[in-house]
């Protein structure tokens, strides 16, 4: 395969071979100014100062002074859904809470009702449009959850759509089974029967078709208890599905501790945690993942990411792209929110959506930084001075080109 040279790069960001960055290391700044990168066989083969760039390379992309960064790694999304929920948005503007809307049949149950009426082909078509949109904004790896089916067949339908996206997209995709997203209306008076369905029917069928990498549970006030979460995750583990958890979004639910107990790859949300949860995370290998776009959209507290990093934790940041609480998969916007509302530095935010986001999907050995042998998922910006400027001047598209698996995907 012909090699590709990216030349005249103003600054290369994210140069390192680490697989996860914690605490003060999240401020690490591996930069080359006036550099080049060579891609061969869809992977980064070399990089360095421009005056050391090889000659006579077959394909040449001129960065024209722009920045080059690893493509974003978004480790928490729900992009397979049937319909938007802007009606609930206007209800919240009038004073209704997320919990009140959910209790009245809105929220997740609203999405489930619409998804159950939508064909697999239509779900694939709409999810493909969303995936293409976020790839164009620089996302090259993504985790996608089920959870709007809430019946065995509809959960399987969602996961088959995710598998089809994986087969037809240049993005690296991880799939998560989230049957324990909410208790369906038909089981409101017998929640144990639904949990039995998850354990005895859904999980075996999901695993039998090889449709998921992970099993997630919404462990929070009004959804699933810690005891229920523990049972579900233990059952999933027997079938080879690793744990992830929605935890501590609405209350101090105990979800962090139950995630750690079940060796969760990540615990996500964390808007309502304190010293106890932070200390527990420090003693574990579970990755805390924060979702600033959700806090912004629901107007709820932001996770204490600053305190977490200052305590020595590494964090991932993800969009939580979904129709109800975060209808955006735009990572550049997320980065501005994280800096402004969580008081993170641009470098910390950058590592949260690159190497640490990759780690939360167990792919940081091949993605999330710029280093020889890693997959060439890259963003080339327009001619701007720095990463700081990229985040500071929010609302403007600073991206010029997106390269996924070594191929030019999108040019502005």
What does each model-found stretch correspond to?
Residues 63-126:
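Metal-associated gating/positioning segment near the N- to mid-region
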Residues 5, 11, 58-62, 175, ...:
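Conserved beta-strand scaffold positions in the cores of enzyme catalytic domains, especially
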Residues 242, 252-369, 381-388, 394, ...:
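Active-site-adjacent C-terminal substructures of enzyme catalytic domains
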Residues 1-53:
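N-terminal metal-binding scaffold of metallo-dependent hydrolase/deaminase domains
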Residues 397-412:
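Short peripheral tails and domain-boundary helices/loops at the edges of structured domains
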Residues 9, 37, 42, 65, ...:
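Divalent metal-coordination and catalytic microenvironments
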Residues 111-126, 132, 140-254:
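Metal-coordinating catalytic core of metallo-dependent amide/deamination hydrolases
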């Amino acid at each position: 395969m012909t090699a590709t040279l990216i030349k005249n790069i103003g600054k290369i960001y994210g140069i390192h071979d680490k697989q996860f960055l914690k605490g003060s290391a999240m401020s690490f700044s591996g930069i080359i100014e006036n550099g080049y990168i060579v891609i061969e066989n869809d992977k980064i083969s070399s990089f360095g100062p421009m005056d050391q760039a090889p000659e006579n390379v077959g394909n040449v992309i001129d960065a024209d002074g722009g920045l080059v960064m690893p493509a974003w790694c978004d480790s928490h999304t729900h992009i397979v859904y049937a319909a938007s929920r802007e009606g609930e948005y206007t209800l919240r503007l009038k004073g209704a809470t997320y919990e009140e809307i959910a209790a009245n049949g809105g929220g997740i149950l609203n999405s489930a009702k619409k998804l159950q009426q939508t064909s697999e082909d239509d779900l694939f078509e709409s999810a493909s449009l969303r995936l293409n949109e976020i790839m164009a904004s620089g996302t090259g790896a993504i985790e996608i959850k089920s959870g709007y089916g809430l019946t065995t067949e509809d959960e399987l339908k969602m996961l088959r759509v995710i598998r089809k996206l994986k087969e037809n997209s240049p993005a690296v995709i991880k799939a998560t089974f989230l049957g324990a997203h909410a208790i369906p209306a038909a089981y409101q008076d017998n929640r144990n029967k639904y949990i039995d369905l998850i354990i005895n029917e859904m999980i075996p069928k999901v695993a039998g078709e090889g449709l998921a990498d992970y099993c997630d549970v919404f462990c929070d006030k009004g959804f699933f208890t810690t005891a229920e979460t523990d049972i579900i995750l233990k059952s999933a583990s027997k079938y080879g599905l690793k744990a992830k958890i929605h935890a501590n979004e609405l209350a101090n639910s105990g979800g962090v501790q139950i995630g750690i107990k079940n060796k969760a790859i990540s615990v996500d949300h964390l808007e309502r945690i304190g010293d106890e949860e932070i200390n527990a995370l420090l003693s574990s290998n579970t990755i805390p993942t924060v979702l600033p776009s959700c806090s912004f959209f629901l107007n709820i507290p932001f996770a204490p990411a600053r305190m977490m990093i200052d305590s020595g934790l590494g964090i991932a940041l993800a969009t939580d792209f979904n129709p109800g609480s975060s209808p955006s998969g735009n990572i550049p916007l997320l980065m501005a929110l994280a800096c402004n509302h969580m008081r993170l530095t641009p470098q910390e935010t950058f590592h949260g959506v690159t190497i640490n986001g990759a780690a939360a999907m167990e792919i940081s050995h091949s993605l999330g930084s710029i280093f020889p042998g890693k997959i060439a998922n890259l963003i080339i910006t327009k001619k701007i001075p720095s990463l700081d400027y990229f985040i500071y001047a929010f609302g403007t598209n600073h991206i010029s080109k997106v390269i996924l698996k070594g191929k030019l995907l999108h040019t502005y």
